[in-house]
Amino acid sequence: MASHTLRPHRSPSPSPEPPVNLANPAKLTRQSLGPPTSGNSKGFGSLGLGPGLASPSSPSQPRHVSSSVAMGMGNRDSLSPRPSGVGSGRAVSATTGPRPSSEFIPTREAKTPEAEQIDQWFKHLANWEATLEEMAAASTDQNFTEELGAIEQWFRVLSEAERTAALYSLLQYSTPVQIRFFISVLHHMSQSDPMSALLSPSLSGSNAFQTQVESKLSNMNLKSPSAGGGAGFAGSSGNGHYLAPDDAAAKAAKARQNRISAPGTLQPHDRWQGQLDQVVERGTSPGLESNMSGRSRSKSPTPEPRPKSTDFSGKPRESLRRESAAFPRSPRVSAGSPGIGLGIGHESPMASPFGNNASWASMVNTPLVQNFNDGKLVAPASVADLSQALNMATLQLNNPGYLPLDDARKYRRPTGGLASGQTSRNVSGQYNDDGEIVNPHTTQPGTPSGLLPNQFGGGRSPLVDQFGLGGLGIGADSTTLANLGLNYNLAGLGGVNPGLNGLTAAQAQAAQMLAMQQQLQNSQYSPFNASAPSLQPGLNPSRRGAGRGQSSHLNQHYNQHQQQHQPGRRSPNPLKSHSPAPGQQTGGGGAGGGAGVAGPEDVDVKVLEDVPNWLRVLRLHKYTPNFEKSNWNDMVLMTDQDLQDNGISAQGARTKFLKVFYNVRTKMDIAHPPGQEEYAPGPKESK
């Protein structure tokens, strides 16, 4: 009964083989670890291991496996994983052949060259994957992208020979893995290049036409539909690969194209998944009907169009529709696009206003005020419009086109050499108190610079000129315009003949309204009302020159009265007090300011008593902390050495102090310290 047990024998049995069950050849009468008798129906026949592995003498006989062989203690020559020939293995009996390789347990030393090649290939694949991941991570780095863009800009300006030399030099630093990567990339690029088919020796007449078509497409920077290729290689639809000749320019054009300030065109694959860009133009936007028809074929939800309240054009919908059909308004809107939004769109010739076929008018925004006037003077519609226009003109006259700062008079450098009693605030005669070049014979300080008769200069309002105020004979002097408000009410214009010199009733009314405005603003000149001359001689419409001469007379009379009643000029800053006039106690201009710069006559005791103000008039206020505990009596007795001991190290400042001190001592009859005669006013005596 031992022959029917499932455990194999320790040694091959010398007894004859049991009979084979014909109904089931795989079911043996005596169980063993050997393969079934029929290898074609079941067992190893399905694995492709044919009957050649069995003994040719008995192909259908089962074989026994001893325990020693099953434990791997057989001959080492029989442990090869490759099937060996007949009689190459150790036979367990006189009739046994080589056993199949699946019965052996291979050791660690048994490795085939194919397995080693596969392992090496997997190692390279893992290395390539890591390299590609690092390349993808580096391409997202902003610093690397900027540096690479600079390299691309430099690469674009090189010639073909220089590009080839540069690439060849860079390839010398490649690692073996990079070399294999470059080989694969270049092989792929050569396959997608249509010129490779043209230069191939196996070119036949059947594909000659296709080759010519691909060559033409490549010259036009288009990709052939039959050519292979992926993203990043030559011939592909994407032009974003690195070190491309036109990549830098394409990126710059794309950056200009993808502006958020204009509605863009988005394809479905270019959209973000969010709904922030689903902004549709108003109903009268050009191309909206075609866009909505294109949207009806899409399953994506479409936002509602803008309401009619956003249409600020004021035109009927039919006229806007005709205008939109005539020419497109937006360069980014295309009729075939499935959606309109704010985002990244495809490049188009009209994407940028700086294209070859774009108009210069699209390079700037539409101005709110028209640039070209037709030259027609439109009369005011009502008295309210006239009053508003006059208010604007008055505002521009009183507020010139510069920012009023501190009083510029106190920063003027004093100059000597004037005759006694001839001191003036404008010493040089070339600049007024605002630092503007003026003519001292015709223009008073404080008036706009460069004013000619019947002109306003930089601050002139076209509204005043529109009403023809030049015909009033008042010229362009803002001071003369101010004189209109010196109690020249509506009754004062009774002598004006509106029918002469083109002076219409509307223009006369404009002059009256302007006079009323000026009267309200110049109310501080009320003492001048009683002595105001009549304006009627200045409004003689026969000659404009006579009116201008009368305006000069009015200016002179007004300036004389201003020196009597309103000494000094008004500071452009309303929060500051008026600057003093010549000869006043708080003069602000060195010569003539009472500080003693111009001579002994230019000394005012009230100015000297306020030491900080005295130093400010002398433009030496930076030394105010040096004289905090001093009065003018002690200061005028100082010598050059005393000033140095007091902390005044600048030679120019000490000289100016000593000259002023000499004038003050002369005015106050104070004895001069010894050695101070050199600071006396007048020409220096040559030694």
From Swiss-Prot:
It comes from the Eukaryota. The keyword Cell cycle does not apply. CDD domains: SAM_VTS1_fungal (cd09556). GO terms for molecular function: mRNA binding. GO terms for cellular component: cytosol; P-body. Residues 52-68, 550-566 have a biased composition (Low complexity). SMART domains: SAM. Keywords: Cytoplasm, RNA-binding, Translation regulation. Residues 29-41, 287-301, 526-539 have a biased composition (Polar residues). Pfam families: SAM_2, Vts1. Residues 606-667 form the SAM domain. RNA-binding protein involved in post-transcriptional regulation through transcript degradation. This is RNA-binding protein VTS1.
